[in-house]
């Protein structure tokens, strides 16, 4: 890939000169005035960016378009650091030193106050009537459910003997339950 770009660069730089030599061979050798030996209309210079943009798959990734910024620009998110040039033997110097701001900034920065310092006037309350709160949600009280309790009759019936105690219990009847599914034969 690097060799391809090298060949394209060499061709782009030498093409005008090769065209000029071919054109000079066609013209007579005697020139009365000092003029250029090649015509710009016949030899078209193809700049390298045109070659790269005509075939975008060969465009290298490592050419990133970045804006040029000053070293000590106030809008940059980081500072540039430099190593100290002279090192004294007995003094401990930190490994990196921050470059001083040599060039003063041309843009005047206006301080933005913190939101806690901004005074907000309170809202004016006019003719507020107090509305009493009414509890619209009633408390739900559980309803007692009567349970049937078997009662024991302790009364003595004259016809029966005194040994038997009759207890009245509710009668239960059994009902056969049939399934609603119809069986197919």
From Swiss-Prot:
Tissues expressing this chain? Mammary gland specific. Secreted in milk.
Subcellular location(s) per record: Secreted
Superkingdom of origin organism:
Eukaryota
InterPro entries cross-referenced by the UniProt entry: Casein_kappa
What are the UniProt keywords, alphabetically? Glycoprotein, Milk protein, Phosphoprotein, Secreted, Signal
Glycosylated residues are 143, 161, 178
**Residues with the Phosphoserine modification:** 161, 179
| Signal peptide feature range | 1-20
Marked site positions, Cleavage: 117-118
Question: In its UniProt record, which GO terms are filed under biological process?
Answer: lactation; protein stabilization
What is the predominant subcellular site recorded for this chain? secreted
A GO CC term attached to the entry: extracellular space
Q: What does this protein do?
A: Kappa-casein stabilizes micelle formation, preventing casein precipitation in milk.
Family designation: Belongs to the kappa-casein family.
Q: What is this protein called?
A: Kappa-casein
**Originating gene:** CSN3
